[in-house]
Amino acid sequence: MQEIENLHQSVLLQEVLQAFTPLEEGVLIDCTLGLGGHSKALLSQKPHLKLIGIDKDKFAQEIAKERLKAFEGRYNLLSGGFAKRFKEALETHNKEIKGVLVDLGVSSLQLDDDDRGFNFHSHALDMRMDLKSDLNAQKVINSYPVIALEKIFRDYGEIKEYKKIAHKIAERRTKKPFKDAKDLSEFLSSFSKNKKIHPATLVFQAVRIEVNSELEELKEFLQCARNLKGAILCVISFHSLEDGLVKNAFKDYAKNCICDPLSFKCACSNNHALGEILTKKPITPSPEEIKNNRRSRSAKMRVFKFKP
């Protein structure tokens, strides 16, 4: 277990604890439990807090369960997509929920596991968070029509040369289908000129988002979260697409006026804000954290406090 503690470092851990300082009791929902690092720290710090942990990765959940053993009776772990499970928990525990945490990152355990296909050297081409899901990265790369590849590279990877990359992949797979992540990564590196990041980074991001329906799930969650009352919502994102959705949702939550933007005069009484944004700018990792954990460098945390 100590090996897991050393392997996976929870991103922005102290900042998360700070965000939930007002919480003393009630229920906190960790929508993306992962290996349970944030949850363990929160349960340790707050003896009267109860936890609902959600994750679609069964293997990660087993590890989290072992790490949370000391808090038996104070937590309940649920399997599945966090948007659906959060909605169910909200319907059952609405008044008790005092905090909600969403960490949208991929864990180090998943990234480093060569059987999962998340890293550039993996001997699998999978990328599924839920191993029961039918769609995997191999199906996307080897079977999607060129126009579909173009769309996900453009929309989910924000890749400038999305057409070129999609066509090159399609051309190569007709001769020899891609067998694993290493094969795909080396192929992308053979013609990409991107010197700032690894040539495969944005393609892998786009495919992972597609395989796991990540943005759709986040949108569904943010819509459902509007129904929270008196709770603190903390979301950690890792790329601009996620952060943009969270930023805009929080702005929408905080709007007092819900009149048509084209209206000349407010007719809604101008008091419809669901709460307030507690982070005018996103919280980012300290230089020290980035030095100790390079994978934290793109993390951004936003916090919203809902009215009772």
UniProtKB/Swiss-Prot annotation:
<dbReference type="GO" id="GO:0005737">
    <property type="term" value="C:cytoplasm"/>
</dbReference>
<dbReference type="Pfam" id="PF01795">
    <property type="entry name" value="Methyltransf_5"/>
</dbReference>
<feature type="binding site">
    <location>
        <position position="103"/>
    </location>
    <ligand>
        <name>S-adenosyl-L-methionine</name>
    </ligand>
</feature>
<comment type="similarity">
    <text>Belongs to the methyltransferase superfamily. RsmH family.</text>
</comment>
<feature type="binding site">
    <location>
        <position position="86"/>
    </location>
    <ligand>
        <name>S-adenosyl-L-methionine</name>
    </ligand>
</feature>
<keyword id="KW-0698">rRNA processing</keyword>
<dbReference type="InterPro" id="IPR023397">
    <property type="entry name" value="SAM-dep_MeTrfase_MraW_recog"/>
</dbReference>
<dbReference type="InterPro" id="IPR002903">
    <property type="entry name" value="RsmH"/>
</dbReference>
<dbReference type="InterPro" id="IPR029063">
    <property type="entry name" value="SAM-dependent_MTases_sf"/>
</dbReference>
<feature type="binding site">
    <location>
        <begin position="36"/>
        <end position="38"/>
    </location>
    <ligand>
        <name>S-adenosyl-L-methionine</name>
    </ligand>
</feature>
<comment type="function">
    <text>Specifically methylates the N4 position of cytidine in position 1402 (C1402) of 16S rRNA.</text>
</comment>
<protein>
    <recommendedName>
        <fullName>Ribosomal RNA small subunit methyltransferase H</fullName>
        <ecNumber>2.1.1.199</ecNumber>
    </recommendedName>
</protein>
<keyword id="KW-0489">Methyltransferase</keyword>
<keyword id="KW-0963">Cytoplasm</keyword>
<dbReference type="GO" id="GO:0071424">
    <property type="term" value="F:rRNA (cytosine-N4-)-methyltransferase activity"/>
</dbReference>
<feature type="binding site">
    <location>
        <position position="55"/>
    </location>
    <ligand>
        <name>S-adenosyl-L-methionine</name>
    </ligand>
</feature>
<feature type="binding site">
    <location>
        <position position="110"/>
    </location>
    <ligand>
        <name>S-adenosyl-L-methionine</name>
    </ligand>
</feature>
<dbReference type="GO" id="GO:0070475">
    <property type="term" value="P:rRNA base methylation"/>
</dbReference>
<keyword id="KW-0808">Transferase</keyword>
<keyword id="KW-0949">S-adenosyl-L-methionine</keyword>
